[in-house]
Amino acid sequence: MTASTEGQARYGQSVKGLLTEKVSTCGADVIALTKQVLKGSHSSELLGQAARNMVMQEDSILHSEDSLRKMAIITTHLQYQQEAIQKNVEQSSNLQDQLKHLLK
């Protein structure tokens, strides 16, 4: 072989080595990119699930607030009824005393 042929062979081997290195680097970059895309997709799914959970919790909170308002109204009505019953008991005691006094 001549010197130029040997130089061309070495140059060809060098180019092949560089190409092999570049191909493996590109492959690693593609794998890293794929992992990042999958991670981003998973993050999006998690955000969507979190949003759905928040909506469900908001509905529960609104329902709880409504229930508390209703319970406050019921409590007020029960207090009025208790006061009316107390007045009736007092009047009943007075009537019993008056009846006892009349029957004597």
Curated annotation (Swiss-Prot):
The keyword Membrane applies. This is BLOC-1-related complex subunit 7. The keyword Membrane applies. GO terms for cellular component: BORC complex; lysosomal membrane. InterPro entries: BORCS7 (IPR032143). It is found in: Lysosome membrane. As part of a BORC-like complex may play a role in lysosomes movement and localization at the cell periphery. Associated with the cytosolic face of lysosomes, this complex may couple lysosomes to microtubule plus-end-directed kinesin motor. Keywords: Lysosome, Membrane. Its main location: membrane. Belongs to the BORCS7 family.
